[in-house]
Amino acid sequence: MLRLLMIADDFTGALDTGVQLAAHGIPTQVVVGQADLSACSSTVLVVDTETRHLPAAKAAKAVEELTRSAVENGVGCIYKKTDSALRGNIGAELAALLKASGARNLPFLPAFPQIGRTTKKGVHYIDGVPVNESPFGIDPFEPVRCAEVTKLIHLQTEIPAQNLRPGETAADKTGILVYDAATAADLETAGRQLFQNGTPPVLAGCAGFAAFLPELLGLSDGSVVETPQLDPRLLVLCGSVNPITLRQMDTAEKAGFTRLRLTPRQKLEPGYWASADGKAALAEIEQMLAANPHCIIETNDAGGNQLTADYAAARGIDLDGMRVGISGSVGQMFGALFGSEHLGTLLLTGGDTLLQCMNSVGARELEPVCELESGIVLARFTYQGRTRYVITKSGGFGQEDLLVELADRIAKH
């Protein structure tokens, strides 16, 4: 029976939140796009609506339709998963959930203190820095312009939104209620307060608060899923421009990872990987994988992305066209390489990259297994009758030595 519906706006976010329940042995399914809630056999269903880059009205419509379906099918709790750095259509999607559910209010707990993302006096911080002054404020595709959460919400909706401090009750309030949380304990306290009179019909937040849902919903039996043995060879496929991920790759390269940067043509020329030059490049990549146990293939140019920007400008490709074109090309490359005997464990970073790579091998559903580190998810899917594993990561997650530490951990497990 479906007990919990989670609605995410990108693939990596769907996984890093769904795994908070799957890691406790709770049957959890992650799907992209449309979902038949009446036919779902999992206890938890996470739907990635792929609305992060859509216009606000279209994003709201997708969330509203899914919410109405959940209400009609008697789903007890709906959780709107938001980005922990507040990217995407936050106000529009929260308003759509509240409106379609018919609930009196929507408790919103945006913090993820476990990885340094906190909300204090209504302002959202990344490692102590207001989010709009952090790397997320200069994201080329979706910069976060405002750190005051209620103001950010009101950029897209007129529904009332107010900030709640630790200890304040939501019982007599209406609209979107933004909770402060500087620690995981703050989230836990807020959760216990919210659930003391039964399960709230709607909630919103990221993986930080979702970590407490197994206990709050009475779904956890105390079990913990063990990490399966993985192929010690590691290929990192990076489509993220986040400075955090760039530093992780620099650190890994210094530690001995082999690093390949795709050229502007490889990233943006339609059909490149099916061309003679593309096939030759794929053969060279296979040779690289055969000769090196730890490899990185990335979409960033050395020293910035001006080369790719110039290439795109000369061909009339705008910023969104670059984003779609690059992720699509990476997906095509991934599909061509996927059957290689030299391919070991995969780590995909960036939601667009993950989606296109999974599309290329026909995997529209993933099952989260466990977290290797906070925000770093191990998931599995079936390909030609075999279980395959993939590690997924949002571009903004992890310490600088993350890739090196993961490679060591996989090799020793």
Where are these regions (language model features)?
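Cap/lid and interdomain-hinge subdomains that line or gate substrate/regulatory clefts
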Residues: M1-L4, P27-V31, T43, A59, ...
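Short beta-strand segments
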Residues: I7, V46-D48, K80-K81, P107-F112, ...
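Short acidic, glycine/serine/threonine-rich loops at helix termini
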Residues: T17-V19, N89-E93, R117-H124, E188-Q193, ...
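N-terminal short beta-loop-beta anion/metal-coordinating cradle
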Residues: A23-V44, L289, P368-T387
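A structural-propensity feature for long, helix-poor, extended segments
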Residues: T43-E50, P293, R380-H413
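Conserved, well-structured core segments that form the ligand-binding/active-site neighborhood
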Residues: D127-E284
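C-terminal structural cap/anchor segments
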Residues: M288, N292-T349
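Conserved, well-ordered active-site substructure
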Residues: L343-L402
